[in-house]
Amino acid sequence: AFPSCVNPAAWYNVVRLNRPLPQDRLMEHASVFNYASVNIDTPYYIIDRAAIRRNMEIHAEVERRTDCKILLAMKAFSTWSVFKDMAPYLAGVAASSVNEVFLGKEEFGKLIQMYSPAYSEDELKAVLPLIDYLVFNSANQYERFKYLIKESDRKIHCGYRINPEYSEVQMEIYNPCTNRSRFGMRAEVLQEVSMRGIDGLHFHTMCQQGSDVLFRTLELVEERFEKFLNKIKWINFGGGHHITRKGYDIDGLCEIINTFKKKYELDVFLEPGESHVLHTGYLVATVLDVIENPTSIDVVILDTSASAHMPDVIEMPYTPEILSARRVLESSDLDMPLEEGRYKYIIGSKTCLSGDIIGEYLFRKPLKVGDRVIFADMSQYTMCKNTMFNGLKLPGIVTCDSSTPDGNIQVVREFRYEDFKTRLS
C-alpha cells in the first residue's frame, strides 16, 4: 500500500539511461543564457550557480517540512568553488575518503558523515578529529577500530551500514543489493553482532528514483530490521533520491520521512548526490572535423571525450543531451529517413579508443568546423571522475549566474601540460 500522496505510476526510472529531457526545457536553457559564450578554449564545464540555488531551495523545503538532515554526497560532486551556494541550505556532507573529508571540512564547513566499505588505521586517525558520524560496513571493522573512537576527544556517532536485500535499480553496476554485494550487513548477520557503541544505521539502495521506491524500501527495512530501529538514535536513508527532477513527489517524500520519524523517534539523514546539481552544468566542446561517410552516417570529431570527460556515458552507458539537437536512441532509428531540415551525425571523441563514441544525434542545421556543441546535465559524476587519458587536456571549470544581467562568468580553473605531467611522476 502507498501513502495517499504517493503515485505508484509516477515513480522514476533512471533519467540518464536514455530517457530524454523535455526538449522545450533544453531550448529554454539555451535561450536564457548562452553557455557557449565564455571566451576560453574548449572544452570546459560551466556550472550555473542560479540553477544550483534553485535545487538547494527544494532540498531546504524538505528539511523544513520534516526536520531531516540532507547531506551532499561528495562522490557525485566536489567542485568546491560553488560550495558557498550550497552550504547555507544543507546540513553537511557525506564523505567516503580522507580527501573528501578534508575538502568537506575546509570548504563546506558543516557536519561530516563518513562511510567507506573499509578503513585503514591511518585513515581513521586522520579523519576522527574532523567527522561527526562514522558508518562501518562490518562489525569486524568496528571491533578492530572502536578503541580509536573511545580515545577521540570528540563525540563520534557510529553506525552500521545494512543491506535490506532489496533494490529496484535495474543496472547491476549500480545495484548495491545483489547477491554478491560488498555493501552492508544483512539482517541475519546483524542479529549475531553486538550493537554496543552503535547508535545509528545506514542503507543506500536507490539510484535516480522517486519517493515511492523509498516507501517500498522502508517496508522491507522495517520488516527485517525493526528490532534495531527501536534501539538507535539516527538512520541514513542513503542517496539516489531524485528530489529536484521535474515531477518528483516531494509531498510523498515528506510524508514518508515524517511518518518514520514519528514512529521510531529517530533523526533522519538523506545523502543525495545528483539531485543537488541536476540540470545545473554543461560541457562545451568544439567541432574539430566533419568526416563524410558514404556508407553510413557522417562523423563529427569534438575536442572532448566520453571516456575521459564524461565517463558515465561509457560506464552506464547512456547518451547525453545536446542543446538544440535530438538524440537517436532506438536501434530502429539508426537507418530511418532524415527528417526534413535535420542532419544526422555520429558524435565522436578525440581519443584513440575505438569505442569512445558519445552518441548519434539529429541537428537542425549542418555542423561545421569551429561550431560549439553544448552537452546538458554535466555537473554530476564528471569533474570528480574525469581523467587525462591519452594526454587529453582536462576541461576548464567555469561558473556563471544566469540570474544576473551579465551572467557573472568566472573562470575557476584551466588545465595545462603541467597538470598532466605532474600526475605521472
Residue ranges and their predicted role:
Residues 256, 270-425:
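Charged (often Lys/Glu-rich) extended helix/loop segments that serve as interaction or gating elements
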Residues 29-109, 115-120, 363-376, 380-382:
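N-terminal capping/small domains of soluble enzymes
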Residues 12-13, 23:
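Short, positively charged and aromatic/hydrophobic N-terminal segments
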Residues 68-234, 256:
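Active-site-proximal beta-alpha core segment in soluble small-molecule metabolic enzymes
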Residues 205-206, 235-244, 272-274:
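Glycine-rich beta-strand-to-loop/alpha-helix junction loops that act as flexible
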